[in-house]
Amino acid sequence: MTKSRKQKQKKQDFLRKKLKVGKPKEKARNATDTSFVSKTISIRNQHLDQNPHDLTKRLTLLKHHNINVRKETLTTFQKSIPSIIKSRLMTPLLTQSIPLICDESQQVRQGLIDLVDEIGSHDAEILKLHCNIFVLYINMAMTHIVTQIQADSTKFLSHLLKYCGDEVVRKSWVKLLNGVFGVLGWGQVGKNDSASIVQTKKRNAKYVTIHLNALYTLVEYGCQDERARSDGDTAETTEDSGTLRNPYLIPDYPQPFEHLKLFTRELKVQDATSSGVNATLLSLATQDIDTRKAVFIEQFLPIVRKKIEVIIKEGGECGKSANKLKTLLAKIFD
């Protein structure tokens, strides 16, 4: 009996039932009833955005794989700077956006430059607080394997010097000079010239002009005080540089004893001479103008004067920038 009943049930699955007039079609046994009405649907771990203007959730988009998303995110933050300049969002914003100095897209890098200009025009002190991170990634860009990233590195340096030049030259005077020499292809003291970029006439003159202008600004901030930059009076500068200032005055900048490195740990450089890095210069504190000028005269000035003479003879925009740099060097060191 049981076997015959199962056979009948199996046969019913393959039989087409006759529809009767006036009666609806029967529903399947596994049909789901969707006729219920609910006022709310609760989904775990999913919440509606209560504040559509909250920019903290956009920070992760700065690491998005799409170039347009990164660019649009930088533009959004740039437009929002006036309203968030005094908020706690600035620190994570700069921490997430500064690595874009080495971004593969030129549009993203230009968007970051515009963002830095917008922040600096509202409050330059914020850029000064993140000066170390800026210098770190600028140095990385100067030695980057991609030529375009390397060429744009001095753009970031020029814009950073415009808002916090004194902070930059005090902390990384020698490193930045070595980096600018590298992108110009001039070779540095203690290094092989073939290791740097070879300077040829085929190189884009536009980028050479940008590099020379960045070097001009770096030397201007590193070897001149604020009064000399504004007035252009060299006599007062040389007179004041030799006088002993009151050591008990409140310093003009934060962390005046940072160069002593009392609470920092540094990695030991093994065989620094063989690697081509002058460890003495890199560890030298360049807090004052006199020290920076002495380092520049001893290590960099002869090379700069030799190279700019060649560029001046070639003429063009590069020649103008080189002549401008030559005038500055004569004003400071002659």
Curated annotation (Swiss-Prot):
Keyword field contains Repeat: no
Which cellular component appears as one GO term in the record? cytosol
Fetch the Gene3D superfamilies from UniProt: Leucine-rich Repeat Variant
What GO biological process terms are annotated to this protein in UniProt?
maturation of LSU-rRNA from tricistronic rRNA transcript (SSU-rRNA, 5.8S rRNA, LSU-rRNA); pre-replicative complex assembly involved in nuclear cell cycle DNA replication; regulation of DNA-templated DNA replication initiation; ribosomal large subunit assembly; rRNA processing
Query: Mostly located where?
Result: nucleus
Cited Pfam families: Ipi1_N (PF12333)
Keyword presence, rRNA processing: yes
Using the UniProt annotation, give all residue ranges assigned to the region (Disordered): 1-32
| InterPro entries linked | ARM-like (IPR011989), ARM-type_fold (IPR016024), Ipi1_N (IPR024679)
Subcellular localization: Nucleus
Parts forming coiled coils: none
Q: Which UniProt keywords apply?
A: Nucleus, Ribosome biogenesis, rRNA processing
A molecular function annotated in GO for this UniProt entry is:
chromatin binding
The entry's other comment says: Present with 4420 molecules/cell in log phase SD medium.
Assembly and binders: Component of the RIX1 complex, composed of IPI1, RIX1/IPI2 and IPI3 in a 1:2:2 stoichiometry. The complex interacts (via RIX1) with MDN1 (via its hexameric AAA ATPase ring) and the pre-60S ribosome particles.
State the protein's purpose.
Component of the RIX1 complex required for processing of ITS2 sequences from 35S pre-rRNA.
PANTHER family given in the database record: REGULATOR OF MICROTUBULE DYNAMICS PROTEIN, TESTIS-EXPRESSED PROTEIN 10
Q: Which family does it belong to?
A: Belongs to the IPI1/TEX10 family.
Kindly provide the name given to this protein in its UniProt entry: Pre-rRNA-processing protein IPI1
Q: Could you tell me which species this protein originates from?
A: Saccharomyces cerevisiae (strain ATCC 204508 / S288c)
Give the gene symbol: IPI1
